[in-house]
Amino acid sequence: MRITTLEAYNITNDILEIWRESVGDELLPVQERAIKEFGLFGDNNLIVFSPTSSGKTFIGEMAMVKAAKSDLKVFYLVPQKALAEEKFEELQRRYAKAGLRVVVSSRDRREFDDAIAAGNFNIAVVVFEKLAALLIGCPQLLEKVGLVVVDELQLITDENRGPALELLLTKLKMAKSKPRIVGLSAVLGKAHLLAHWLEAKLLVDTQRPVELRKGVLCKGTFKYREHNSGTLGSEEFADMGGTERQELLLEAAEDLAGRGEQVLVFVSARATTVLCARILADRARLPMLKSAIEELDEQEETHAREALRESLSSSIAFHNSDLSREERALVERHFRSGEIRVLFSTSTLAMGMNLPVKNVVIEGKKWHYFKRYDRWGLDDMSRSEYENMSGRAGRLGLAKEYGRSILVTDSRFQADVWLEKYAAGDFEEIVPTLAEAPLEDLVIDLLASGMAGSDDELRDMLLSSFTGTTSWALKMSKDELKEKLDKAIAICVEGGMATREKGRLKITDLGFVCASKGVGVETTISLAEWARESRRSALSPLEVLTVAAQSTAGADVYVSMSKQERWKADYRRQILGRAEQDRVIERPVFAGHILEQDAASHDSSMAFKKALMLCDWIEEVGIKEIEQRYLVWAGAVRRVGEDFSWLIEAMGAISVTCGWDESRKSEFTELSERLQYGVKRDAVELGRLRVLGLGRTLLRRLVRAGYTRVQELLEDGPARVREVLNHRGAFEKLWMKISKMKEATPSTYPKKAQPEVLLAAEPVERAMAASGNEAELLIDLKANRVCYRGHQVATRPPHHLQRTPLLALAVLASHAGELVSLTELAEGVAKLGHLKKIPVTPDARDLRYKMLRPIKRALPQDLADGIDDLIESIHGAGMKLNCLAELRC
C-alpha cells in the first residue's frame, strides 16, 4: 500500500510528504492491515501486538497525527523519560513544519505542564506516571483529549511499572469522555484478555519486515531458527575456547566486528559494559574514532569520559545510565551513523534506546530481586525481554537480508534449552500487577482524581481494573476485598489524607499533594511528620536532603554502595560533621545518631551518602571529585539529583499543607531546581535553558562573567558570549536556543531596566474606557478583594487565594495581555508586597494552579470549566493574563 493512497482517508498532502520522507513510499504489511482491516483512522480502540521493529510504532504515529490534524488533543505515553525525550525531539522535528505543537512531560521536564493543563498542545509525549499526576491536578483534561497512544503496553505485566499503567488505563476506560485508546505491544500470550478489557480490536502480527536469525552460539556454532520462515540453520563462528559468559560475549563481538559488521551487546550490569568495552578495545584491531574523541574532549571531565576515550580508540563504546546526557547523546549518534562498531549496553536500557543494528549479542541473564529471599540475584530473562532486545537486530534499512540475535553459552544442553525457549517457545501470559501496589496508594489516587468518593465506589473502580476483572473478581470474596479496602482507607484517614463526611470520603489537601506528586502514602506520612515538627526552623538543604533520603521514595532511588565502602567511608560520621558545621546538629534527623555506638545500618548509610553527595552536587563541587569521593559516576549523580528534585518539590507542597507559610515554598522550589542542574542559586535561570553540552562548568563560567539571566546574554550579543564560553559546540546550541525564545516572544527582550508594576488603576481604566469594555478581573489590594466576572474570590481561609499568588496575579493584571517574565514577576511581587528581599523566581506551573483554583471555586461550573486559558504560562518566557483587568493599590 502506497503512502499516497492515504489521501483517501483525508490525510493532507503536507503530512503525506512528511511520512514519505520518514518511512518511504510503501507501508509495511502490518501497517496496511491496521488501516484496511482494523479501522486505524476510525473511532474504535485498537491494540497492536507485533514484534519489535515490525512497524507498529508508525501505526501509533499515523493515528496520532490524523487525530491531531482533526483538532483532537493526543497523548503519546511512554515508560521512560529517555524514550520521552527521544520521541519528543523526533515528533517536534518532523511535524513542527506542519503546524503541530508537540510538548513533553516527565518528572524532571515540567516546563510544558501549564500548556498541557490549558490544552495548549496538539501532541503531548508523557511518561506513564506523569500523566496520572497531571490528571489528578487537572481532571478536566480528559475532556479535551481525543486519543491516547500507549507505547510498550506489555509493561502492564511488569511488577514495577505495571500498577501505575493499569490504574491509568482503568481511569481512561471509565472516564465519561471515553478517549480512544491505541495500544502498541510486543507479543504476549492470551492478548485477547487485555483487548477484551479495553473493549479494543486486536491486531496480532508476528511477521518482521527483515528476517531475523534467533539462536544460540555454542563452541563455534551458531544454531538458529529464522523468525518468519521457521527454518532451522547454523553458521560457523571462530571458537576461541572461552568458557566464562563474559569471554563468550567478547569472542562473538570480536568475530562479527572482524567481518566488518556492527554489533550491539546486551549485558546484565553497568560495570560489565565498561569492562567489556575496555577489554575488547585493547585486543581488537579496529580504527580509532577520531571525530568522536574530539567531541568528547570538549565535554566535562568525568571518569566515564576517560573510559569512553579509551574504548573509542578502537571504535568501541559502552552505554549505561552512569553516562551524562552529553556522553549518551554522543555514543548514540556515532552508533547510529555506523562509526561505533561494537556497543556494550545494559539490558535495562533496551527499551529506552532506539539503536537498530544488524547483530545483537545477548548475555541471557538479568539481575532480579527475589522478594521471598529479600535479595538480588541472576535469573534467566523472560521471553518478552528477550524479544525486546533481539528486536533491535535486523531492522528495516539496516540489514538487507537478515539480522542475528545471538545468545552465548558453552553448554550444549543450555544451548538446546535456550533455542527452544527463546526462538520457538510460547510467550508469557499477561499477568495483571495492580495487586502488587500498596492499596492505600490506589485509594488516594482514586479519591484525588474524583473517580471515587465512597467505599462502594472505590471497590467498583478497583474491580473494573484489569486485575479486578481477571483476578480479584474470580479469586477473592467480597468480604476479603472489603477487609483489605477498609484497612487501606483507615491508613489514609489516620494519616490525614482523607476524611469521612456524611458517609462520603473526601480528599484532604495533604492527600491531594500525595496523589498529584505521586510520592506514595507511606512517604507522605513521614515527610508530613517532619514538616509539622520543623515549620519554625530555617531551611537547611542538608537536613531536607537527609529527610528525603530516609523516606521510602528516597530509598527507592538507586545508588551503589559496597560493604567495603560502607565501613571505610563512615557516612554517618561525615554527615554529623557536616551538620555540626552547618549548625543543624541539634535537629532530630541528626541528633538521634550522635550517641550511637554500633555501626550505622546499610539503609542509614545509604541515605547519608545520598544526602552528602547531593549537597556537594548543588554546591558545584567538581564532578570528578564527587565521583572519587562517593565512588559513583557523573551520570548517576545527575540521575539521583533529578529524582530528588521531584521529591523535594513534593516536600515543599507537603510542608505548606502542614502549616508552613506559603511564601516558604519557594525555598523548596529553588532547592529542587538546583538539584536538577547541579548548580548554586545564581545559575538556576540559565540552567533552565537545558542546553545539551552547557553543563555546570560552563554555566559557572557565564555567571562569573556577570550573566545570570537570558536577557543579559542577549544584551551583550553573540560575540561577547562566545568569548566567555570559549566552547564552540555549547555556544552554538545556547545561542540557537535563546534566539528562538526571542523570536517567539520578542516583546520581552531585551529586559527592561526595572520591572514596571502598575500601582494605580488609571492607565488600565483609560484603556478600557477607550475600548468601551469593562474589566473582567478586579483586584483591590487595599481591601484584599478579588472579583472575576462579578463573582467574589475568597482571599481568606479556607481554599483562598493566598498572598503570594494574589500579588503575582496583581502583577499580571498590571500588564494584562502582555507577557511578564518570571524574573519580572518575582520583582513585581516584592514591590507590591513591600518585601525587603526579592523572592526566588516562581514555579510557573504551581503558581498558575494556585491562582486559578480559588477563582474556579468562586464560579458556577459552566464558567469554571472555561477559564483554563485565563492565565497562560509560556515555556522559557513567562506568564500572561488573558483578560481586561483593573488593579487598585
Regions from the language model: what does each represent?
Residues 791-834, 851, 855:
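Short amphipathic alpha-helical recognition elements used for nucleic-acid or partner binding
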Residues 184, 191-197, 201-275, 317:
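Conserved interdomain linker/interface between the two RecA-like ATPase lobes of SF2 helicase motors
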Residues 445, 486-488, 494-495, 499-690:
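C-terminal helical accessory/scaffold domains
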Residues 754-772, 836, 843-889:
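DNA-binding patch around the recognition helix
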Residues 379-419:
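Conserved segment of the helicase C-terminal RecA-like domain
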Residues 2-49:
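Conserved pre-motif I regulatory segment
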Residues 75-76, 85-88, 92-103, 264-344, ...:
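Conserved C-terminal RecA-like helicase domain
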Residues 155-211:
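Post-DEXD/H (motif II) to motif III coupling segment of the RecA-like Helicase ATP-binding lobe
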